């Protein structure tokens, strides 16, 4: 199971806690390879593991991420209805919300979405107007430029 040659370091399994301890069972710990992050010039840091905030939530507001996730779930739900199929069977199309937010007007946005849904045999007007309502006021999630 453990391969010390992997980029993430070796995985070490600790024995399960004794009976009656209420512990969850065996735990897996990852050991960094020599010279990995966390080791300074003076050797290994003795401070123990440091919990870091995820990269995505550092760059973006959690509230905006939640709004975007809810929007994506809504889009998937609507597309399964429009194409009358399961999520896995939806034709390959990408509705890029950031691209839509970059456009000057709702008319341009609507035209772009209509262009993407050209193969849909059901009416798309309700979906398009709902999508435009939902993205109104959203912020782009493009990667911020470093200075």
Swiss-Prot record:
Species this chain originates from: Homo sapiens (Human)
Positions carrying N-acetylalanine: 2
Q: Pfam families from the entry? A: PP1_inhibitor
Coiled coil is among the record's keywords = yes
Q: Which residues does the record list as Phosphotyrosine (modified residue)?
A: 29
Does the UniProt entry include the keyword Coiled coil? yes
Q: Which residues form a coiled coil?
A: 61-103
Record-level Gene Ontology MF annotations: protein serine/threonine phosphatase inhibitor activity
Q: What does this protein do?
A: Inhibitor of PPP1CA. Has over 50-fold higher inhibitory activity when phosphorylated.
Residues recorded as bearing Phosphothreonine in the entry = 57
Instruction: Report, as the record phrases it, the tissue specificity of this protein.
Output: Ubiquitous. Expressed at low levels.
Q: What is this protein called?
A: Protein phosphatase 1 regulatory subunit 14B
Keywords of this entry: Acetylation, Coiled coil, Cytoplasm, Phosphoprotein, Protein phosphatase inhibitor
């Amino acid at each position: 199971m453990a391969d010390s040659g992997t980029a993430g370091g070796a995985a070490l399994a600790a024995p399960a806690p004794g009976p009656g301890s209420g512990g969850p069972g065996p735990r897996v710990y990852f050991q960094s390879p020599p010279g990995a992050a966390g080791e300074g010039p003076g050797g290994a840091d003795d401070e123990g593991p440091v919990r870091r905030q995820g990269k995505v939530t550092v760059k973006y507001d959690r509230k905006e991420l939640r709004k975007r996730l809810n929007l994506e779930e809504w889009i998937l739900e609507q597309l399964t209805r429009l194409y009358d199929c399961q999520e896995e069977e939806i034709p390959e199309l990408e509705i890029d919300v950031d691209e839509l937010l970059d456009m000057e007007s709702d008319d341009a946005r609507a035209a772009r979405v209509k262009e993407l849904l050209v193969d849909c045999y059901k009416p798309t007007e309700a979906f398009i107007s709902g999508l435009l309502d939902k993205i109104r006021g959203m912020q782009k999630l493009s990667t911020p430029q470093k200075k």
